[in-house]
Design a protein with these regions (language model features):
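Glycine-centered, phosphate/nucleic-acid-interacting loop/turn motifs that mediate DNA/RNA or nucleotide
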Residues: 55
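Short, hydrophobic-biased segments on the C-terminal half of alpha helices
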Residues: 45-49
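Short, cationic-aromatic polyanion-contact patches
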Residues: 4-10, 62-81
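Short acidic, hydrophobic short linear motifs in intrinsically disordered regions
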Residues: 24-33
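Short helix-capping/hinge SLiMs at alpha-helix to coil transitions
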Residues: 19-23
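Short helix-coil junctions and helix-kink-helix linkers
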Residues: 32-41
Length: 126
């Protein structure tokens, strides 16, 4: 995936289901899962086309309809989204992000210790 494309809320709902199913799906299956949303087939097809255009799903064309499968894992998407946030709002600075997150509030001692251990582990991997 060359460029990061953020998903709309509806696209994210659909992707979560596709990731959770962990098997290729059809429009009909997705419409059944989202029957409470009362989306028409064209609406679902539009969402799936957008997800494909963003490089998030792969489409396999079959005679009885397309089959859709994730092109990236959920974990990879979250990594890309986090990196995009870091780059766009904090110039890629993790320290800037953590400072904004902390914002003068109190940090739980246990959480601070877990973060310290995590940073030590990350440092060892380099």
């Amino acid at each position: 995936m060359k460029k990061f494309y953020k998903m709309s809320d509806s696209e994210m709902e659909i992707m979560k289901v596709i990731w959770e199913l962990a098997t290729p799906v059809t429009v009909t299956q997705l419409l059944s899962i989202f029957e409470n949303r009362k989306w028409k087939i064209q609406t679902m097809a539009t969402f799936l086309t957008r997800l494909s255009d963003k490089g998030l799903i792969a489409i396999t064309k079959k005679t009885k309809g397309n089959i859709y499968a994730p092109a990236i894992t959920e974990q990879k998407y979250h990594q890309l989204e986090a990196q995009n946030l870091l780059d766009s709002m904090y110039n890629g600075s993790l320290q800037g992000f953590l400072s904004a997150l902390y914002c003068g509030g109190e940090v739980d001692v246990k959480e601070a210790e877990e973060l310290r251990k995590w940073f030590e582990k990350v440092g060892e991997d380099d």
